[in-house]
């Protein structure tokens, strides 16, 4: 069920008009408000009979504060213009003002006693009183009495005005005439200046300090006056003679600086901006390489053709001139315009470039020919490229020398030395060491051939490695592989020179730590694969609810 929508009450003014028009019932507050029968209206209606508030505007909301009488304030007097000279006019009292006017007596003022002036202070100058025009226009009243008479009399002061037609020059009466300044004339201006001298900060005129000039109040510098030395120990500096019209160069250069040709610090004219570098490697330019050396200085010879018809001797020089014309570069023959040379620094060297415009292959009706743009260049300084083949010279390696291989016997017996290189160690063992005879002349085995040692050196008197090689006598049966393990050093002898001997021994129990191969030309070693730790795969097992293993994946 939907809630009833609340209907807003109509405006009281609309309710009152509807009720009066239709004759229906209206709310009592609406009727009292528009018929002014509220208690407040009744109080104002009956209270205004006995009390009169005038035009104060109580209850109107204006707040004007009363009614203005006339053009000015209540009881006010219009201002009198200062232009007319004579007695003041008697103004009538306005009828709208208050009926009772209270007269306030004025007390006479004593004459002003001048204050004593301080001799140490400047005297005060009083400016003359100047009557200036009013800021606002005043109301001018007509004079009701003639200026010749003085009707105004307050009983205390007598003012007598003598008409202008009477002559008072010889009556023995002194009349003082006061001249009033004109309204437009502001009068003379007075400027005062006061100076105080403090004797505490006075500087003596005579001083012994060289170059002191602040001691005197006035300094006069003249071209014809002689110089005066201030102080005893003064350094004399030669000065130039100054004359009118001469220009003195006051340029001061620091030590080590040189004078330049510039006269002013600011340039007198705007410098010309340098042109932007050309970009001749765009798609709109055809790249043409020119090999003729005349392209560098006299490129016009490669473009223009000489006409042999105008020569004097045609029969003798026609063929030669024609050959000379045909000698022109074919790439520059149809060029219509050629720019100035540009020098560029490339990775291959110094390059001279010129931008050219070929003759138009397409012409319009107006005579305009459209041609292609080309970039002509020539490399004059190839860098990194040999002009002529140079024979290669074999150079010795600096700071490197071959190693020394020494065969040292175990017991104190004479040793056998053989100089070999470290890089060709395997080849030396096969080719040179096998030629050593280890048997005596009687055919018996020599004891000196056993327990030999190989000592390898880098050439800097530093022993790299020493290993003992037990060599068997007879033929090519010599050790090939050394296997070091916990049980000692195992030597594997090859049974055949053709078959390949495995590096790993046949017994799986003998697992070597390091395998050394003397015939590979290197002394590096590798860890046996059996010693490397293998990565185990994590097995996933499936369990039942009772905890038993269901199966093991392979």
UniProtKB/Swiss-Prot annotation:
Leader peptide range in chain numbering: none
Short motif (Nuclear localization signal): ranges: 2-10, 533-540
Disulfide bond in keyword set: yes
Major localisation: virion
Alphabetically ordered keywords of this record: Capsid protein, Cytoplasmic inwards viral transport, Disulfide bond, DNA-binding, Host endosome, Host Golgi apparatus, Host nucleus, Host-virus interaction, Late protein, Microtubular inwards viral transport, Phosphoprotein, Viral penetration into host nucleus, Virion, Virus entry into host cell
InterPro entries: Late_L2
Family recorded in the similarity comment: Belongs to the papillomaviridae L2 protein family.
Role according to the record: Minor protein of the capsid that localizes along the inner surface of the virion, within the central cavities beneath the L1 pentamers. Plays a role in capsid stabilization through interaction with the major capsid protein L1. Once the virion enters the host cell, L2 escorts the genomic DNA into the nucleus by promoting escape from the endosomal compartments and traffic through the host Golgi network.
Protein name as annotated: Minor capsid protein L2
Species assigned in the record: Human papillomavirus type 41
């Amino acid at each position: 069920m939907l809630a009833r929508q609340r209907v807003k009450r109509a405006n009281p003014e609309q309710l009152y008009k509807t009720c009066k028009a239709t004759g229906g019932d209206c709310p009592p507050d609406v009727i009292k408000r528009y018929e002014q029968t509220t208690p407040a209206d009744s109080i104002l209606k009956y209270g205004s009979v006995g009390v009169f508030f005038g035009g104060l505007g109580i209850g109107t909301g204006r707040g004007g504060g009363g009614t203005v009488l006339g053009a000015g304030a209540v009881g006010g007097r219009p201002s009198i213009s200062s232009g007319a000279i004579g007695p003041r006019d008697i103004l009538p009292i306005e009828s709208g003002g208050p009926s009772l006017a209270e007269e306030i007596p004025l007390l006479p003022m004593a004459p002003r006693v001048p204050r004593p002036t301080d001799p140490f202070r400047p005297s005060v100058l009083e400016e003359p009183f100047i009557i200036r025009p009013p800021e606002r226009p005043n109301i001018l009243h007509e004079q009701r009495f003639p200026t010749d008479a003085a009707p105004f009399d307050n009983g205390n002061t007598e003012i007598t005005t003598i008409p202008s037609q009477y002559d008072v020059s010889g009556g023995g009466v002194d009349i003082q005439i006061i001249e009033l300044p004109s309204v437009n004339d502001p009068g003379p201006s007075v400027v005062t200046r006061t100076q105080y001298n403090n004797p505490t900060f006075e500087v003596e005129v005579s001083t012994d300090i060289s170059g002191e000039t602040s001691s005197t109040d006035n300094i006069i510098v003249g071209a014809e006056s002689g110089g005066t030395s201030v102080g005893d120990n003064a350094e004399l500096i030669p000065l130039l003679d100054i004359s009118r019209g001469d220009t003195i160069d006051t340029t001061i250069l620091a030590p080590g600086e040189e004078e330049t040709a510039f006269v002013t610090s600011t340039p007198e004219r705007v410098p010309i901006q340098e042109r932007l570098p050309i970009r001749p490697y765009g798609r709109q330019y055809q790249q043409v390489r020119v090999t003729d050396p005349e392209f560098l200085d006299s490129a016009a010879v490669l473009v223009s053709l000489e006409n042999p018809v105008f020569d004097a001797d045609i029969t003798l020089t026609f063929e030669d001139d024609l050959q000379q014309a045909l000698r022109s570069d074919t790439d520059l023959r149809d060029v219509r315009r050629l720019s100035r040379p540009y020098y560029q620094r490339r990775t291959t060297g110094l390059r001279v470039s010129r931008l050219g415009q070929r003759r138009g292959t397409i012409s319009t009706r107006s005579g305009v020919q459209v041609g292609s743009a080309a970039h002509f260049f020539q490399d004059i300084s190839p860098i990194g490229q040999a002009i002529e083949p140079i024979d290669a010279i074999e150079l010795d390696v600096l700071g490197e020398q071959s190693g020394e291989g020494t065969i040292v016997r175990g017991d104190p017996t004479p040793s056998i030395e053989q100089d070999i290189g470290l890089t060709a160690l395997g080849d030396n063992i096969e080719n040179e060491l096998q030629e050593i005879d280890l048997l005596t002349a009687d055919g018996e085995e020599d004891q000196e051939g056993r327990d030999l040692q190989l000592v390898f050196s880098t050439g800097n008197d530093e022993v790299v490695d020493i290993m003992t090689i037990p060599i068997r006598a007879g033929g090519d049966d010599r050790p090939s592989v050394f296997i070091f393990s916990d049980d000692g050093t195992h030597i594997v002898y090859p049974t055949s020179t053709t078959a390949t001997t495995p590096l790993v021994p046949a017994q799986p129990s003998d697992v070597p730590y390091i395998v050394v191969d003397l015939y590979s030309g290197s002394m590096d070693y590798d860890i046996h694969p059996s010693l490397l730790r293998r990565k185990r795969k994590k097995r996933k097992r499936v369990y039942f609810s009772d905890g038993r293993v269901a199966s093991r994946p392979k």
